Amino acid sequence: KYYGNGVHXGKHSXTVDWGTAIGNIGNNAAANXATGXNAGG
């Protein structure tokens, strides 16, 4: 399952695509604050 911001989780593990995650942090910071961290994806 893809949760947005570069985070992918399976039944037994989760992984982070750090390139995507770091690229999205700045883009989503304000939106995350406004939505309780549900922005992006």
From Swiss-Prot:
This is Bacteriocin bavaricin-A. This heat stable bacteriocin shows activity against species of Lactobacillus, Listeria monocytogenes, Pediococcus, Enterococcus, Leuconostoc and Lactococcus. GO terms for cellular component: extracellular region. Belongs to the bacteriocin class IIA/YGNGV family. The keyword Secreted applies. The keyword Secreted applies. InterPro entries: Bacteriocin_IIa_dom_sf. It is found in: Secreted. Signal peptide: none annotated. Keywords: Antibiotic, Antimicrobial, Bacteriocin, Secreted. One of its GO terms (biological process) is killing of cells of another organism.
